[in-house]
Amino acid sequence: PHIGRTNRWLAPIGAVDLDGDGAVEVAYIDRPHLAKTLRVWRFKDGALVPVADLPGLTNHRIGETDIGGGIRDCGQGPEMITASADWSRVMATTLTDGQLSTRDVGRHVDRSSFTTALDCEPL
């Protein structure tokens, strides 16, 4: 999706059927240093269509060499793992009936916090 200006980018979270409807959704953070918005899109009828947005989340900081977080399934369906916009918390977000809901899963300390969350371990 177009985000407007040069030198702006998207930080992928992953692509999987997030809501159990059989269609694959694509999740990413729109401009992780500026907009800090989780966006979910679905490929439908030959085009990408927006599904849901949720502000206040991010997965990359200026100077980092990788993108943190990802998608996990701890037995109750896929969850997108990101950080809160201020990097204080690790967040798990689900897609249900076209709506995103997020919950705090623990304190963000460093990159190992993402690894722990993705491994379904408590923080």
Please report, for each region that a protein language model flagged, where it lies by residue.
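Beta-propeller-forming repeat regions
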Residues: 1-123
